[in-house]
C-alpha cells in the first residue's frame, strides 16, 4: 500500500498524518475502529475505546478502572479473584461469602487451597488429622467415632475388638460366645468346621460344636437304643445309677410298658416292670 492510497478501511478517509489502528493487517481511523470493533464494558456498559486497556475474562470485558470486586469495590487489576453467579469477587469477599468453613478450626478455607470433605463437613488439609496420633489423614482410610476421626491403626489400637479365633480385628458384626467375640465366618464347629452362624450348637470347654459333633463326641448314649441323649431340644431322659435312657425308651424289657414315673426292677442293666420282674433274680 502506497502512502498515496493509505486510507481507513471502513470510511475510506485518508490516514496520512493521522492516528490509526491496525486490525487483521487493515488500517482504521480511531473513530471507525472504536465504533465498529470496541467491546462494551460489563460494568459501565460503555465502549472500551482504543486508547483504553481492555480487560477480558471468559469473553466478558471491562475498562481497567471498572474491573473491581462487586462487593467491596476494590480493584482486581493484577490481583487474584473468583467468580460467583457471574459476579467478580476479591478472594477475601469470596471467602467470606462463598467458601467453606473448616469444621475443626472454624476458619475460612481459602479458594484454591486443598480441602477435605467427610460426612458433609469440610476441613483444611492440615486440620483433618487422626484424633489420636494427630497425623494428617488425607485420603487414607479412616474410622469415625463420636470422639473424632481415627486412622485405621490408631482405631484398632484404641477401640477395636479382636476375634477369639483368628485374632484379627472385627470391623463390623460379630458373634459373642462365652464372653468372647468371633467373626461370623470364624464361628465354626470345633469338630467338623461347619458354619454355626445359623445353626444350633453346643459347647464343651468353651469350644463350640454343632449338635451332630457334640452328640458323637460327648453326649451320653441311651442304654436302650444306643443313640445320643441331647438336652438341646428339651428332650426328657431318665438317669439311674450310671445309665441313662430317653424317656420314650425307658420301657420294660419284657412287655415294653413305659416305666416313666413307675417302680421297676433291674437285672444285668435291663429294666422290668414289677409284674414281669417278679420271680426273677433281679438286682433290686
UniProtKB/Swiss-Prot annotation:
One of its GO terms (cellular component) is nucleus. Keywords: LIM domain, Metal-binding, Nucleus, Repeat, Zinc, Zinc-finger. It is found in: Nucleus. Its main location: nucleus. Residues 39-100, 101-160, 161-220, 223-283 form the LIM zinc-binding domain. It holds the Pfam family LIM. PROSITE patterns: LIM_DOMAIN_1, LIM_DOMAIN_2. The keyword Nucleus applies. It comes from the Eukaryota. Testis-specific (at protein level). One of its GO terms (biological process) is positive regulation of transcription by RNA polymerase II. May be involved in the regulation of spermatogenesis. Stimulates CREM transcriptional activity in a phosphorylation-independent manner. Interacts with CREM (via the third LIM domain). Interacts (via second LIM domain) with SPAG8. This is Four and a half LIM domains protein 5. It comes from Homo sapiens. The gene is FHL5.
Amino acid at each position: 500500500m502506497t502512502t498515496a492510497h493509505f486510507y481507513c478501511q471502513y470510511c475510506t478517509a485518508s490516514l496520512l498524518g493521522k492516528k490509526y489502528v491496525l486490525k487483521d493487517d487493515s488500517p482504521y481511523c480511531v473513530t471507525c475502529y472504536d465504533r465498529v470493533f470496541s467491546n462494551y464494558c460489563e460494568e459501565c456498559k460503555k465502549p472500551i475505546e482504543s486508547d483504553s486497556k481492555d480487560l477480558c475474562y471468559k469473553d466478558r470485558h471491562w475498562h481497567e478502572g471498572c474491573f473491581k470486586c462487586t462487593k467491596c469495590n476494590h480493584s482486581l487489576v493484577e490481583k487474584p479473584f473468583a467468580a460467583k453467579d457471574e459476579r467478580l469477587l476479591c478472594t477475601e469477599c469470596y471467602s467470606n461469602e462463598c467458601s467453606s468453613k473448616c469444621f475443626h478450626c472454624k476458619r475460612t478455607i481459602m479458594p484454591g487451597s486443598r480441602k477435605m470433605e467427610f460426612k458433609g463437613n469440610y476441613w483444611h488439609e492440615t486440620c483433618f488429622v487422626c484424633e489420636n496420633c494427630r497425623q494428617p489423614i488425607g485420603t487414607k482410610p479412616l474410622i469415625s467415632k463420636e470422639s473424632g476421626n481415627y486412622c485405621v491403626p490408631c482405631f484398632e489400637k484404641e477401640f477395636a475388638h479382636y476375634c477369639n479365633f483368628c485374632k484379627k480385628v472385627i470391623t463390623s458384626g460379630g458373634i459373642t460366645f462365652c464372653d468372647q467375640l468371633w467373626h461370623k465366618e470364624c464361628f465354626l464347629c470345633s469338630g467338623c468346621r461347619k458354619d454355626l452362624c445359623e445353626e444350633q450348637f453346643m459347647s464343651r470347654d468353651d469350644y463350640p460344636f454343632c449338635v451332630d459333633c457334640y452328640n458323637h463326641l460327648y453326649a451320653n448314649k441311651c442304654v436302650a437304643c444306643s443313640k445320643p441323649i441331647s438336652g438341646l431340644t428339651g428332650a426328657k431322659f431318665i438317669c439311674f445309677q450310671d445309665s441313662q435312657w430317653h424317656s420314650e425308651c425307658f420301657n420294660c424289657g419284657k412287655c415294653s410298658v413305659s416305666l416313666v414315673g413307675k417302680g421297676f426292677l433291674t437285672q444285668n442293666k435291663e429294666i422290668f416292670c414289677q409284674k414281669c420282674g417278679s420271680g426273677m433274680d433281679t438286682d433290686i
